[in-house]
Structure formats: structure tokens, C-alpha cells
Amino acid sequence: PHHLGSLGYRVGIAGKVHVKPASAFPFENINGFDPNCVRNPTQEHNLNGIRSFMQRDNKQPFCLIVALVEPHVPWVMGDSSKYPPSKLDLPPTIADTPRTRKDFSKYLAEITYMDGQVGEILNTLKKTGGEKDTLVLFTSEQGSQFPGNKWTNWNTGIHTALLARWPNHIT
């Protein structure tokens, strides 16, 4: 994204931005997504800022980074009742205790909440008419925040997601 501005792109970022100095990241800040990852509860998101950014100039390409804070401790977003702790199959890297089962339930609820946000963002892109000619990348920053996962060199700590969607280019 650093070099896209000089190539004629509008570059914007919404959500979690933990970079300094701001002058090294010449992105337009877009409101609507919580920049704080440990607020309880996380602020509800609002799509108006990204919708306005996407629609501003149909002739100029854009790069929009939406840095979602979910899933992140304290895992307060979403409906954890959909994931009863006693019925969960825990990954083998997570200790099976009542506390980890309860926490994993909240973690899954936040992932579901985040998935809903991604769907709303994609729907906003579709409504603005940019769905067919926009490369969408989805990635995560680290493994889950369970003991032995984040902050380790094991696969559960460093494995991240990367999904790409670009109609008629990537299948």
C-alpha cells in the first residue's frame, strides 16, 4: 500500500492502526471501525466511512485496508451461546480445561462476528459497483491468543490466513 499512492491510487485504512510514525504511512484514515483491540466491548462498526471512500471517485482506483480487531482478547463480541463449551472440540494445542473451553467459546463467537463484518464489507463493495473489478485480500496477523499459540514459533503461533478473491482473475 505504501507505493500505491504514487501510482494514482487513493489509499485508505480503517480500524486497528498500530503504526508509527504516522508520516511513514500516508494513508487516509477512514472512520467506522474500532482502532482499539482491547476495549470491552469493542465499538460496533459503521460502514458509512468505507462506503463513502469506495464511492468517492469511480475513475480512480483505490486500496482500502480494513483492519478488523477481532478476534482479540478479551473476546467480548458475538454470541458465545452458539458455542456451548461442553460441546466444543478443542484443537490439540489447547489445554482442555473449563477455562479454556469457556474462552474458546468466546473466541469462536468473535470469529463469527468478524465473519459477519467481512460479509457486510463485501456487500458494501458490491453495492458500490466495484465487486467485479476489485481484488479482495483477507489475512490475519497471528495465531490465536491461547497458551502455546500466539508469541511462539510453533505453527499455531505463526500460521495466518490469506484468502484472495478477484472475479475472472482468481478462482
Regions found by a protein language model. Give the residues of each.
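Formylglycine-dependent sulfatase
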Residues: 1-171
